[in-house]
């Protein structure tokens, strides 16, 4: 737009053309303030003239660059600029953001929302993939164990199968030999126990028939386990010898029956006591 003023006649009868002014923002701050003060005064004067000439109600608000408010109002509009409510409304309108700023803020909010939506989508995808992977692993495991569940394999067979796999396909003949040896050892143990029981009973009877003096001779239960075994063996040998020899009316002395009484497991005092005991005749006890 351009501001064109009408020409005025001169003394020579020629009209002088007025200069044209381009309407745009003034970059110079000093010139901007001067223009504001002049134009403000002129527009206030025009508003007053308009209200007087036409009898209309006029309200004019002019706000400076520094935030000062200049007003012109007819009597009916005076409460708007004089009362506190009107001033607060004017201040609220001045504090409101411009349309351009609002548009920029809305665009920025939309961009942020889009970014948030994209991040949420990216987060949901890995979370959805994890349950799918877990389900696949479970299905594969169930398929691998399906034939075991259908056949109802016992726990012992399953353990043997695992052991055979760990051994790396060992020879089945060796496994059968090992099982036979285990079975043989298990059967031989009860037989040994049955053989030992009569021997122990016989040894106890022999000891009861031949009492020993309590002085100088330790009790069999107080000796070591090795000594007890040695004595039991000696008693068994003596019993066998007695069974082999013919029975006669004359009893032989105990020195012959207990030829090995001086055991290497006894000390010197015990050996002396044994020799003294066996050298004495024991015929009166029978």
UniProtKB/Swiss-Prot annotation:
Keywords: Acetylation, Activator, Arginine metabolism, Cell cycle, DNA-binding, Nucleus, Phosphoprotein, Transcription, Transcription regulation. Residues 122-136, 171-246 have a biased composition (Low complexity). One of its GO terms (biological process) is regulation of arginine metabolic process. The modification Phosphoserine is found at residues 2, 144. The modification N-acetylserine is found at residue 2. Signal peptide: none annotated. Transmembrane segments: none annotated. Residues 18-72 form the MADS-box domain. It holds the Pfam family SRF-TF. GO terms for molecular function: DNA replication origin binding; DNA-binding transcription activator activity, RNA polymerase II-specific; DNA-binding transcription factor activity, RNA polymerase II-specific; DNA-binding transcription repressor activity, RNA polymerase II-specific; molecular sequestering activity; protein dimerization activity; RNA polymerase II cis-regulatory region sequence-specific DNA binding; RNA polymerase II cis-regulatory region sequence-specific DNA binding, bending. One of its GO terms (cellular component) is chromatin. It is found in: Nucleus. The keyword Phosphoprotein applies. The keyword Transcription applies. Residues 97-119 have a biased composition (Acidic residues). It comes from the Eukaryota. Residues 97-137, 167-264 are annotated as: Disordered. Coiled coil: none annotated. InterPro entries: MADS-box/MEF2_TF, SRF-like_MADS-box, TF_MADSbox, TF_MADSbox_sf. Homodimer. Binds DNA with a high specificity in complex with mating-type protein ALPHA1. Also binds DNA with a high specificity as a heterotetramer consisting of an ALPHA2 dimer and an MCM1 dimer. Interacts with YHP1 and YOX1, possibly leading to its inactivation. Interacts with ARG80 and ARG82. Transcription factor required for the efficient replication of minichromosomes and the transcriptional regulation of early cell cycle genes. Activates transcription of ECB-dependent genes during the G1/M phase. Genes that contain a ECB (early cell box) element in their transcription regulatory region are transcribed only during G1/M phases. Interacts with the alpha-2 repressor or with the alpha-1 activator thereby regulating the expression of mating-type-specific genes. With ARG80, ARG81 and ARG82, coordinates the expression of arginine anabolic and catabolic genes in response to arginine. Present with 8970 molecules/cell in log phase SD medium. PANTHER family: SERUM RESPONSE FACTOR HOMOLOG. This is Pheromone receptor transcription factor. The gene is MCM1.
């Amino acid at each position: 737009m351009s501001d064109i003023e009408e020409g005025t006649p001169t003394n020579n009868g020629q009209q002088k053309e007025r200069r044209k002014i381009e309407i745009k923002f003034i970059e110079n701050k000093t010139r901007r303030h001067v223009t504001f003060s002049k134009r403000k005064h002129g527009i206030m004067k025009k508003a007053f003239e308009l209200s007087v000439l036409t009898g209309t109600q006029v309200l004019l608000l002019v706000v400076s660059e520094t935030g000062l408010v200049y007003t012109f109002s007819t009597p009916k509009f005076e409460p708007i600029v004089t009362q506190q409510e009107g001033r607060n409304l004017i201040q609220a309108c001045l504090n409101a953001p411009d349309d351009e700023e609002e548009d920029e803020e809305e665009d920025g909010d939309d961009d942020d929302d889009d970014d948030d939506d994209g991040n949420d989508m990216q987060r949901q995808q890995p979370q959805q993939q994890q349950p799918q992977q877990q389900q696949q692993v479970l299905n594969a495991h169930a398929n691998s164990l399906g034939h075991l569940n259908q056949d109802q394999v016992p726990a012992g067979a399953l353990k043997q199968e695992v052991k055979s796999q760990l051994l790396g396909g060992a020879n089945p003949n060796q496994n059968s030999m090992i099982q036979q040896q285990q079975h043989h050892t298990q059967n031989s143990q009860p037989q040994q126990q049955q053989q030992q029981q009569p021997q122990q009973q016989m040894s106890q009877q022999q000891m009861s028939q031949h009492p020993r003096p309590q002085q100088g001779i330790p009790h069999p239960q107080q000796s070591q386990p090795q000594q007890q075994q040695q004595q039991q063996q000696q008693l068994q040998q003596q019993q066998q010898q007695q069974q082999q020899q013919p029975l006669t009316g004359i009893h032989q002395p105990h020195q012959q029956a207990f030829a090995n009484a001086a055991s290497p497991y006894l000390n010197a005092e015990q050996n002396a006591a044994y020799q003294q005991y066996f050298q004495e005749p024991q015929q009166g006890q029978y």
